[in-house]
UniProtKB/Swiss-Prot annotation:
Primary gene name: mutL
Protein name per UniProt: DNA mismatch repair protein MutL
InterPro entries, sorted: DNA_mismatch_repair_CS (IPR014762), DNA_mismatch_repair_MutL (IPR020667), DNA_mismatch_S5_2-like (IPR013507), HATPase_C_sf (IPR036890), MutL/Mlh/PMS (IPR002099), MutL/Mlh/Pms-like (IPR038973), MutL_C (IPR014790), MutL_C_dimsub (IPR042120)
Keyword DNA repair: yes
Species this chain originates from: Rickettsia bellii (strain RML369-C)
Keywords of the record: DNA damage, DNA repair
Function: This protein is involved in the repair of mismatches in DNA. It is required for dam-dependent methyl-directed DNA mismatch repair. May act as a 'molecular matchmaker', a protein that promotes the formation of a stable complex between two or more DNA-binding proteins in an ATP-dependent manner without itself being part of a final effector complex.
The organism's place on the tree of life at top rank: Bacteria
One GO BP annotation of this record: mismatch repair
Length: 611
């Protein structure tokens, strides 16, 4: 076959394959064009999730008839300065979107330039048969896309259901709307309004806050910390959820570079690392985080879809984002999710409140007690400890922990108003500490709370290299199931040494342990080493020190803590509460579960119909 030059329409259809994957891709490109045009109002109308019809209307700068004619040609744009290709401030700059969309659909563009008397429209079918004519239109541009992919029917077979395609489009509009709270957006599907967002004219932070409430929800703002970092060539701002307010997927994570929505692995990993000490591995935080960076320090021209970026100094960006998130979380590190308490309130709502008043029956002291049925607890992330953790529970010393908690704070009773978590009043089922503040009661899970306290303490010991080793009087020989586990432990002996464990190879399948961390006291060395060997075997040979530290610290803290079922004195309960108030991230244990919930007095009064 001889080499030949492809036709312009064929080239455009090939380009469309990279840029336009589904109706959501069309909406993204056209809405971004509307934003670049300086619009203050953008309306989107869809039929059959955009498969039949997509209409994008804006009140932007508009186009003349001459501009309309060349706008649908490849690589024509008003947004790129050829002398400064790296200094890109707009969404679009490649000049590919309109001709690519036109090549696979029936397109009609109507536009009127600002301050011009006349409007014009251009009609294209499959990118050909261009027809320009006068029209009647307000200032701005309206683009109609009909029968998407009619020119490439094979692509239609790969589209999902209308519901799935619509969800993708809604997600695209939400992301762009979050980045531009000053613009009004509406999205209508088959005659039904799905989104109606009013443009804000307040200060920048309040604009963003209100738009986040409209898009993600007010609950998110109530359970989020504000991020605020500034430097000469870099800034990070936005909101990120506290650890106990999380989701089972990452769908509600919105990340932006210079107001451009991105799915960047570097940023996603940084977000994960920032939360790794405070959230289960199968849960995800919610966030709307904006990074503003000098355009010359980031490359957005990696792919035509422009969802991926490259940083000039990726490690700098990664570390800066991690530190910014951690600093923001530390401002609310003692707070547990407000939705947990709300869920609890809903469970106990009296069905007769606000209806006919129910008459309480007098108590019959001679009647037999009815069977006790515990109330269903609110849903929280489920944590299943590993077998080795449970096996080690009974082997660990509690004397050191008890001695620490039993330190007397004051001889006189503590006042509820003195402390954020209040004064301890009772212990429920030898598991939960009940305390009272001025306007609420607080229920604390004693094991989860002390587990977080222990985790932070051990983590600081390791970070500051203050973990003291205790030499065993008689070295412990641990026999492992196979030679592989013994080899992996020995290969990581230097890393384990930094965690307070000194060991050597002793035969093919055995390890001899000579030193352990002093903080653990009389621990069952056999079970600890077997647990570590199993973990290293799962992770492979090249486990990072940070990952090893995380696993070992969690294991230490799990057994370090006060167990459920242990009776505490009033002073012990108050000591635990005071330590929580002075320990970062005490609102959740290191598995992401809440350590306490707070029930406001006004909510309790509502339960009894008082308010």
């Amino acid at each position: 076959m001889t080499i030949k030059l492809l036709s312009e329409s064929t080239i455009n259809r090939i380009a469309a394959g990279e840029v336009i994957e589904r109706p959501a891709s069309v909406v993204k490109e056209l809405v971004e064009n509307a934003v670049d045009a300086g619009s203050t109002k953008i309306d989107i109308i869809l039929e059959r999730a955009g498969k039949n019809l997509i209409i994008i209307s804006d009140d932007g700068v508009g186009m003349t008839d001459k501009e309309l004619e060349i706008a649908v040609e490849r690589h024509t744009t008003s947004k790129l300065d050829e002398t400064d290709f790296l200094n890109i401030h707009t969404f679009g700059f490649r000049g590919e979107a309109l001709p690519s969309i036109a090549a696979i659909s029936k397109m009609l563009i109507t536009s009127k330039k600002r301050d011009n008397q006349k409007a014009f429209q251009i009609k294209l079918i499959g990118g050909d048969e261009k027809q320009i004519a006068p029209a009647i239109h307000n200032e701005g541009t309206k683009i109609e896309i009909r029968d998407l992919f009619f020119a490439t029917p094979a692509r239609l077979k790969f589209l999902r259901t209308d519901k799935t395609e619509l969800a993708a489009t809604v997600d695209v509009v939400k992301k762009i709307a979050l980045a531009h709270p000053e613009i009004s957006f509406s999205l209508t599907h088959d005659g039904k309004t799905l989104l109606k967002l009013k443009g804000q004219n307040k200060d920048a932070e309040n604009n963003l806050k209100q738009r986040i409430i409209d898009v993600i929800g007010e609950d998110f703002i109530k359970n989020a910390s504000y991020i605020d970092f500034k430097s000469p060539d870099f800034s990070i701002y936005g909101y990120t959820s506290i650890p106990t307010y999380n989701r089972a997927s990452s769908e509600d994570q919105f990340l932006f570079i210079n107001n451009r929505p991105v799915k960047d692995k570097l940023l996603q990993v940084a977000l994960r690392v920032a939360y790794q000490d405070y959230m289960p591995r199968d849960r995800y935080p919610l966030c709307a985080i904006f990074l503003q960076i000098d355009p010359q320090l980031v490359d957005v021209n990696v792919h035509p879809a422009k969802a991926e970026v490259r940083f000039h100094d990726p490690n700098y960006v990664r570390n800066l984002l991690i530190d910014s998130i951690k600093n923001a979380l530390s401002n609310k590190s003692h707070i547990a999710s407000t939705t947990i308490a709300s869920s609890a309130i809903e469970l106990f709502k009296n069905p007769f409140v606000n209806k006919e008043p129910a008459i309480s029956k007098p108590l019959n002291v001679n009647s037999k007690p009815s069977e006790y049925r515990p109330a269903t607890s609110p849903t929280v992330p489920k944590y299943t400890p590993n077998n080795s953790c449970q096996k080690l529970i009974d082997t660990l010393p509690h004397a050191r922990i008890e001695q620490e908690v039993e330190q007397r704070i004051q001889n006189e009773p503590q006042k509820s108003s003195q402390y954020r978590l209040g004064a301890a009043k009772a212990q429920l089922h030898t598991t939960y500490v009940i305390s009272q503040t001025e306007d609420s009661i607080v229920i604390t899970d004693q094991h989860a709370a002390h587990e977080r306290l222990g985790y932070e303490k051990i983590k600081n010991y390791i970070k500051n290299e203050e973990l003291i080793k205790q030499r065993l009087l008689i070295p412990e020989i641990v026999e492992l199931p196979d030679e592989k586990r013994a080899d992996i432990l020995y290969e990581n002996k230097d890393k384990l040494s930094k965690l307070g464990l000194s060991l050597e190879k002793f035969g093919e399948k055995s390890i001899i342990v000579t030193e352990i961390p002093n903080i653990l006291g009389d621990i069952n060395v056999q079970k600890l080493i077997q647990d570590l060997a199993d973990h290293l075997a799962e992770c492979g040979e090249n486990i990072a020190l940070t990952e090893l530290i995380e696993h070992v610290t969690e294991t230490y803290a799990c057994h370090y803590s006060i167990r459920a079922g242990r009776k505490l004195s009033a002073d012990e309960m108050n000591a635990l509460l005071r330590q929580m108030e002075n320990t970062p991230f005490s609102g959740q244990c290191n598995h992401g579960r809440p350590t306490y919930i707070e029930l406001k007095l006004k909510d309790i009064e509502r339960l009894f119909g008082r308010k």
